[in-house]
């Protein structure tokens, strides 16, 4: 399927406080964020024109920047308003929302404390890609070569651009080998997450998922755990060794893009997508639908 290059699209991007035409949203090639990874971002989705968990994402966006030793010069409320504006201005109902912040081009060295902090928000069309029955076939995951870093070595709780380098490498390798994605281990060889989503397993009716201490405790992950508990499903957060995968019944991943997606294989391990996966696919789909007051607020923009 042909995908229109992102630099050739139309619409508006919010950049440093103002809406600008898509093709005018540019940064200098000597921006510090490009060379030294002083950059963080968010991944969000709008359903029916309303951004799901917008405030939680804005709060994490600012926290991520603080962990990278810079401050986003907008409040949570200003970021929420800017995101809603750019969704409405582009006329999307179901779309992906990408806030990003980076150090600018005033300084080009490891230290760049006087570089301007730039912020942009872009959106693009992103409908739900699969129906429930298609999802229930499950995807296949490779096991990544690279591991999530020790929290003593990197700000693992930040959605920092630099931390995605090994994710890109791992997903490229997985796709070349015929897989949809890759499961990553942590620095001690235990199960961690996928390249852009959290991973959960089911055994004897309970969900088991790794403790989120060296990777993002995803907003979707938190939502899905809450939904599982609300439906009477026990959730156990613990250390999981790779060899334990042989004993799990179901496996699924969750994230902004993935939503809730069952897994049929992780390397040599096989799973059968089942009722808990189905229940959470349906519960999450209901949870993301905007309420009447949210729709009214979006219309008033």
Residue ranges and their predicted role:
Residues 79-107, 124:
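Short, acidic/charged, Gly/Pro-enriched secondary-structure junctions
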Residues 1-85, 110-301:
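Helix-start/capping segments and mature chain N-termini
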């Amino acid at each position: 399927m042909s995908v229109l290059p992102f630099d050739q699209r139309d619409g508006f991007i919010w950049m440093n406080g103002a809406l600008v035409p898509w093709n005018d949203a540019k940064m200098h090639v000597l921006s510090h964020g490009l060379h030294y990874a002083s950059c963080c971002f968010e991944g969000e989705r709008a359903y029916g024109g309303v951004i799901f968990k917008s405030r939680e994402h804005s709060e994490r966006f600012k926290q991520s920047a603080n962990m990278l030793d810079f401050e986003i010069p907008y409040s949570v409320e200003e970021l929420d308003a800017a995101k809603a504006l750019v969704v409405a201005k582009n006329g999307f109902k179901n779309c992906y929302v990408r806030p990003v912040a980076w150090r600018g081009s005033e300084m080009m060295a490891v230290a760049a404390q006087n570089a301007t902090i730039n912020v942009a928000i872009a959106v693009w069309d992103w409908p739900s890609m699969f129906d429930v029955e298609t999802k229930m076939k499950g995807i296949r995951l490779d096991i990544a070569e690279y591991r999530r870093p020790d929290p003593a070595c990197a700000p693992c709780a930040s959605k920092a651009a630099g931390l995605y380098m090994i994710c890109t490498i791992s997903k490229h390798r997985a796709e070349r080998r015929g897989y949809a994605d890759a499961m990553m281990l942590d620095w001690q060889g235990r199960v961690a997450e996928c390249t852009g989503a959290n991973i959960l397993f089911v055994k004897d009716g309970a969900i088991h998922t790794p403790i989120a201490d060296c990777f993002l405790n995803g907003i979707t992950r938190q939502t899905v755990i809450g939904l599982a508990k609300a439906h009477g499903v026990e959730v156990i957060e613990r250390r999981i060794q790779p060899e334990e995968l042989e004993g799990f019944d179901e496996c699924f991943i969750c994230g902004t893009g993935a939503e809730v997606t069952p897994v049929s294989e992780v390397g040599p391990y096989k799973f059968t997508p089942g009722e808990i996966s189905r229940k959470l696919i349906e519960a999450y789909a209901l949870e993301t639908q905007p309420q009447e007051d949210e729709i009214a607020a979006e219309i008033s923009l």
